[in-house]
Amino acid sequence: MHNSIECLRPNAVATHAKVALFDFDGTVSLIRAGWVEVMVPMMVEILHDLKSGETEDQIREVVLDYVGHLTGRQTIYQMIALCDEIQKRGGTPKDPLFYKHLYLDLLMEKIKDRIAGLRDGSIAPETYHVPGTVPLLEGLKARGFKMYLASGTDDKFVKDEAQLLKLDHYFDGGIYGALDDYKSFSKAILIKKLIENAGVRGDEFLGFGDGYVEIENVKQVGGVAVGVATDEPECQIVDEWKRKRLAGVGADYIIPNFLQHQDLFKLLFPE
């Protein structure tokens, strides 16, 4: 530990890095904090209604496992997994998009006051920042990083919410979210395009995320990855469930928030 920074690979330095890739929800934004508590009960209820003989707790374990495994990918993949589980229990699933819209309706009900408050100015943007986000982004900008935001949340929502949080201008590389044609975009595809079209080398990537996917994608190309194991919404301690998954896919560092960004920079960019 380095204050609240857990260093899993002491020699992981980002001295060659030029590109920073960020996830959105749970990494820099807390607008959707609590989404797991919306998605999981919805799925548990749907599966429990199939009367497979499992207890609610047994079903919850199954749901938590695949929801966690797919965090960071487009939301539709979690709904495809739900459809698979419905079939396994002898049910006939509807289209995954049906379940995605059902989930988004429930989530919007939970977060509508947050969005409205940010939009009318009654809530300050930093209320829904992961602590230390702005100083971290400012520090990376000062180091000449080109920054990209890539999220599993729908494209129109990510762009709107990044703007409401007044974070959009930091991401000069662009803001990318999920598309209806979900196979046409992923974080891995974005990284591949940057390598092929922008001439970015794998070791020039620095990734930040609270989900399995972006950490794995950055590590696969040889970049350095910081696992942001936010215990939402306070984000003062490490969420052990997130930590285990992030460490499991090769995160170099684990942090609960960005408040120790200067210490993190000393580790990433030793002089």
Residues covered by each model-derived region:
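A short, structured active-site edge motif that brings together acidic residues
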Residues: 97-98, 168-184
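Substrate-recognition element of Asp-dependent hydrolases with the DxDx(T/V) motif
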Residues: 27, 39, 122-129, 133-163, ...
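A metal-dependent, Asp-based hydrolase signature
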Residues: 65-142, 146
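Glycine-rich phosphate-binding loop signature in dinucleotide/nucleotide-binding domains
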Residues: 142-145, 197-203, 268
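Acidic, Mg2+-coordinating phosphoryl-transfer loop and its flanking beta/alpha structural elements
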Residues: 151, 207-253
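Conserved Lys-Pro-Asp/Glu-containing loop-to-beta segment of HAD-superfamily phosphomonoesterases
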Residues: 185-218
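Active-site neighborhood of HAD-like aspartate-dependent phosphohydrolases
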Residues: 2-61
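Short acidic-hydrophobic, aromatic-tinged amphipathic segments that line or gate anion-handling sites
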Residues: 176, 252-260
